[in-house]
């Protein structure tokens, strides 16, 4: 799994309903948790 992500803040909403700081963080979380998380949309998830 890729674990080094930039700290640039370009938030994306994952298909799991969580907001990630950027797409790299989402991809890393999906890999580490062995789940299929995709980008639902760019920007924060609606709470």
Swiss-Prot record:
Subcellular location: Secreted
Superkingdom of origin: Eukaryota
Database matches in PROSITE patterns: KAZAL_2
GO terms, biological process: cell differentiation
Residues marked Reactive bond (site): 7-8
Family designation: Belongs to the conopeptide P-like superfamily.
Name this protein carries in UniProt: Turripeptide Ici9.1
């Amino acid at each position: 799994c890729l674990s080094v992500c930039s700290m640039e803040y370009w938030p994306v909403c994952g298909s799991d309903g969580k907001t990630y700081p950027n797409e790299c963080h989402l991809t890393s979380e999906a890999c580490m948790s062995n789940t299929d998380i995709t980008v639902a949309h760019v920007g924060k998830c609606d709470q």
